[in-house]
């Protein structure tokens, strides 16, 4: 038999044996990221027609995040002046900022403080994040926030470092200012 679990956050279930036996298919943010063609198709559903160059710019700026692509296209179609170019998308205002605010609202105040203060870092290294934020347990906090799918990803490399999605970081920096 087969079981499918779809969840926004990674469930705390014992997947080790299934993973070891190659009986587990995990689909994450990287696999769900839209490419330029998929971006074009999604934008067209809002009535916003993109050429190839615009679709590539929007896919790159949103890192393929479907919700951001849709919201940017919707904003462009409904309020042409708010987004002049497909790649001119930010987390500072409009539909994307509204979405990010609603996603951050249920987060603990310390976590919001941590995210906002550490948004000044291009790459978030846990010890540096603790120094910048003034809050302890950065590594555990980053793991927990990443598991909650808050647009935080681990950067591959010899040291454990993290990176915030461009639009999330843009939003947090705007809030910090």
Language model region names:
Residues 12-16, 86-87, 138-140:
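Intrinsically disordered, low-complexity boundary segments flanking structured domains
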Residues 8, 53-55, 97-174:
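C-terminal boundary/linker of central alpha/beta nucleotide-binding cores
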Residues 18, 83, 94, 107-108:
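Generic signal for short, ordered secondary-structure residues
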Residues 1, 24, 49, 68, ...:
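A general structural signal for well-ordered secondary-structure junctions
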Residues 1-75, 94-101, 167-174:
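Alpha-helical sensor/transducer elements of the RecA-like P-loop NTPase core
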Residues 90:
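Active-site diphosphate/adenylate-binding microenvironment
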Residues 42-44, 56-61, 67-79, 85-86, ...:
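C-terminal helical "lid" of AAA+/P-loop NTPase domains
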């Amino acid at each position: 038999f087969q079981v499918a679990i779809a969840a926004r956050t990674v469930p705390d279930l014992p997947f080790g044996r299934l993973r070891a036996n190659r009986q587990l298919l995990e689909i994450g943010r990287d696999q769900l990221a839209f490419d330029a063609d998929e971006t074009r198709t999604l934008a067209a559903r809002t009535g916003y027609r993109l050429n190839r160059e615009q679709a590539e710019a929007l896919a790159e700026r949103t890192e393929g995040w479907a919700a951001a692509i849709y919201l940017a296209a919707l904003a462009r179609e409904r309020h042409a002046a708010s987004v002049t170019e497909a790649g001119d998308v930010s987390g500072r205002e409009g539909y994307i900022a509204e979405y990010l605010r609603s996603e951050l609202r249920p987060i603990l105040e310390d976590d919001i403080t941590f995210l906002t203060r550490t948004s000044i870092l291009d790459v978030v290294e846990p010890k540096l994040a603790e120094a910048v934020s003034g809050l302890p347990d950065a590594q555990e906090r980053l793991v927990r926030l990443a598991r909650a799918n808050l647009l935080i990803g681990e950067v591959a490399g010899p040291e454990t470092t993290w990176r915030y999605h461009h639009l999330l970081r843009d939003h947090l920096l705007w809030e910090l200012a």
